[in-house]
Amino acid sequence: MSLHEPEAQPSLKKRRRDSFSNADPKRVKRLHSGTQRLHYHDIGPSVNELKTRIRDVKRLLAKRIDDLPADVRVAKERELAECQRDLEKAEVKKQRSKMIQKYHFVRFLERKRATKELKRLKGQLHKLENDDRLDPNARENSIETLNRKISASEIDLNYTIYSPLTEKYISLYPNERRKQQPMEPEESNVIRTNSGEKPPLWYTVKQSMADGTLELLRDGKLGIGLSGEKKDSNNADVSLKSNTMSLLVHRKQKKPKSKIKVDGDEDAKRSSARSVQEGTRNENKRTSKEDVQGEDDDAESESDGGFFE
């Protein structure tokens, strides 16, 4: 190699790789996962964290309720009630995301079908309105029929979009076409009807279209269930209050020390009954052995000689 020959320059790919050589890929991955965890915790505590906190507060109230000061006890009871409310919200949110993932594919297919049907009906209506060859009375009747079908098709489309995400999705279309085709895995959990009747939530969507509450219906803020009627929310509030105060009631209902004596008497009664049962069992065994021995003696006396005698 001569002295005047220039040194080989590293390639662009090599230079680019060397410029990031100080960054460890594992370290970068750890940093990204850490930011994701921080972002997740910014949203709110998870279901498991809330359950752990509720369990800890319940244990504290159950064990040290007589030793805690009044203000601390009240603060812990409020914290318990808040954690239970947060847990209920977190479970609803988790169930909502689960139902969205479960019925997303079927909603997509039926939304495409409803959109296609609505477009076809509107095309027929446009042609019918511009056709002057038909009788006016017949054309009016046909237009009225098409308008009813278009209205129903619009409700079908809104049903596929705004049906409550927290509830099971009932299919709009009957099962006739799917008898000949294999069912997709995503469609196995969908409730279908062979009669073609509209599900109960279809009429709720129709009413929400008139009221302008489709967004609230989809997010489950109207409290509408699968039957198309409002759910009973009073039971949830009662359960929260009962869970919060059950510890205090359980603690106050403790019996005095006389209960221990009663338990001891019951244990003595059980042990005496057990001993009586064992005695009778032993006597039965003795009598059975004596009977068997007597039968064997009789058999030996009556024996007239066998193969080994």
UniProtKB/Swiss-Prot annotation:
One biological process term in Gene Ontology: maturation of SSU-rRNA from tricistronic rRNA transcript (SSU-rRNA, 5.8S rRNA, LSU-rRNA)
Compartments in which it is found: Nucleus, Nucleolus
Coiled-coil stretches noted in the UniProt entry, renumbered to this chain: 70-134
Biased composition (Basic and acidic residues): 260-270, 280-292
InterPro entries assigned to the protein according to its UniProt record, in alphabetical order: Efg1, EFG1_rRNA-proc
Region (Disordered): 1-37, 176-196, 244-309
Keywords: Coiled coil, Nucleus, rRNA processing
Compositionally biased region (Basic residues): 249-259
Acidic residues bias spans: 293-303
GO CC terms of this entry: nucleolus; preribosome, small subunit precursor
Biological function: Involved in rRNA processing.
Family: Belongs to the EFG1 family.
PANTHER family, alphabetized: RRNA-PROCESSING PROTEIN EFG1
Name used for this protein in its record: rRNA-processing protein EFG1
